[in-house]
UniProtKB/Swiss-Prot annotation:
This is Adenine deaminase. Catalyzes the hydrolytic deamination of adenine to hypoxanthine. Plays an important role in the purine salvage pathway and in nitrogen catabolism. It comes from the Bacteria. GO terms for cellular component: cytosol. Its EC number is 3.5.4.2. GO terms for molecular function: adenine deaminase activity; zinc ion binding. The keyword Zinc applies. HAMAP family: Adenine_deaminase.
Amino acid sequence: MYEWLNALPKAELHLHLEGTLEPELLFALAERNRIALPWNDVETLRKAYAFNNLQEFLDLYYAGADVLRTEQDFYDLTWAYLQKCKAQNVVHVEPFFDPQTHTDRGIPFEVVLAGIRAALQDGEKLLGIRHGLILSFLRHLSEEQAQKTLDQALPFRDAFIAVGLDSSEVGHPPSKFQRVFDRARSEGFLTVAHAGEEGPPEYIWEALDLLKVERIDHGVRAFEDERLMRRLIDEQIPLTVCPLSNTKLCVFDDMSQHTILDMLERGVKVTVNSDDPAYFGGYVTENFHALQQSLGMTEEQARRLAQNSLDARLVK
């Protein structure tokens, strides 16, 4: 069934470009930029990809991102991801990038954006993959820092379709960024936010009511709140679910416990995505395949999940 799933036309709506940095490219960029790495080789780095929680993953993720220095680096990162999309019949992408991960290291905002944007434009021209780029704020940093990042983004307003919110969830509720999101919306941005991954269902309520998001990234803990489930179904609010990420970060102990198909059958508009595929062992097709292998997902369910992803695009 893998080949059939691979050929299914689909969109990817929850993908961090920095999370597509495969070990081989990481080492190549480190060599190009003359950066010493704490790992001896690709295999040693791959062995480090064993996480017990979100924070352990983030620590490695930010360490890996340090090799991204130049416009060409960001182009190469994005282009490698788009080639993977072409191979898996992902026809539309709405990736996140985290400018603060780079500007806090002294990399100018416009350098990061120029490389990513050029690759996305080439992806549309040369590979036929449509896109919309989402600027994501790091929630473990302050509201003031998010406001500064929004200031940096405004001269490039036409480069983005939306703002988002990611990084360490627990202790950083969506309400912390309500004023930033209000301002972003007043500037014409759509909004999305990570909520209900490690954080409680209350964070999903906040994202909907305070940040006024178009869709929820992750959202799997909505299953614990029946009233919230009813709202998601009634309003057809999309959830961008990332199955392999959820098991790798121990949101679910095992894929057999994942609730995505239960949510689908109840009428929630769930989609399948890869989140940080270089770190979690699979791109979109591998995530679909894991659901088929562990949960017995049928072809009909796969078609619905793929159609949900196309329907839930911010750029139609």
